[in-house]
A protein has these predicted regions:
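Single conserved hydrophobic/aromatic residue that forms the stacking wall/gate
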Residues: 169, 174-177
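Metal-dependent phosphohydrolase cores
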Residues: 1-2, 27
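Short, basic/aromatic beta-hairpin or loop at an interaction surface
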Residues: 10-19
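Short amphipathic, charge-patterned alpha-helical segments
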Residues: 2-10
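Divalent metal-coordination and catalytic microenvironments
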Residues: 6, 59, 87
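Short acidic beta-strand-loop surface patches of small beta-rich interaction domains
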Residues: 18-30
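Auxiliary tRNA-acceptor-end handling modules of aminoacyl-tRNA synthetases
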Residues: 31-34, 38-51, 65, 74-80, ...
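Active/ligand-binding-proximal structured segments within catalytic/core domains
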Residues: 9, 51-67
């Protein structure tokens, strides 16, 4: 895996690594490197590494915090922007500026649990079924409108109750490395 490669080079690099680029394609740090390839290790201090970290915070941590606090909400998109990230959601409850501290505290609580984040590949049909069962209509729209031919990357936190569909994330195996 990219993590193993970084670890072989040095423990400092392994700690700073967030993803890899294999033959020009960004991949999760714990993905296998299947063949002889040109591999770059993406670190947290790079622009690409910062974007991956922000995307993980929005797609996994912020989204889960929002679902914990507003369980009947529907998640739309959670992109990164120049100086951070945000998440579009639909909820019947009002969210005020005062709620931001509560949301941030919930994010810190989620981070402290050190949940594992794993990637699973699912067909379009399977992904639609998963998001239908989670009552996530916007995720279903995103998947339906996607023109990709390959399977979708779905990211699960350890209890498999929270799923994000996305691109490269920080992945945390169950052993916490």
């Amino acid at each position: 895996s990219g993590y193993d490669l970084a670890k072989d080079i040095g423990s400092g690099l392994a700690k700073a690594a967030v993803a890899i680029e294999v033959d020009g394609k960004q991949q999760d740090l714990h993905d296998s490197i299947e063949k002889d390839s040109t591999v770059s290790i993406i670190t947290i201090d790079s622009e690409a590494g910062l974007e991956i970290m922000r995307h993980t915070l929005t797609a996994q941590v912020l989204a889960r915090a929002l679902k914990n606090i507003y369980p009947k909400s529907s998640l739309a998109i959670g992109p990164t922007i120049d100086n951070g990230f945000y998440y579009d959601i639909e909820t019947n409850e009002s969210i005020s500026i005062d709620d931001l501290n509560r949301i941030e505290n919930e994010m810190h609580k989620i981070i402290k649990t050190k949940s594992s984040i794993t990637k699973k590949f699912k067909s379009k049909k399977e992904a639609l079924s998963i998001f239908k069962s989670l009552n996530e209509p916007y995720k279903q729209i995103i998947i339906n409108e996607a023109e990709q031919k390959e399977d979708f990357q779905l990211y699960y936190q350890d209890d498999d109750k929270f799923v994000a569909v996305s691109y490269t994330h920080l992945t945390l195996p169950t052993n916490g490395e």
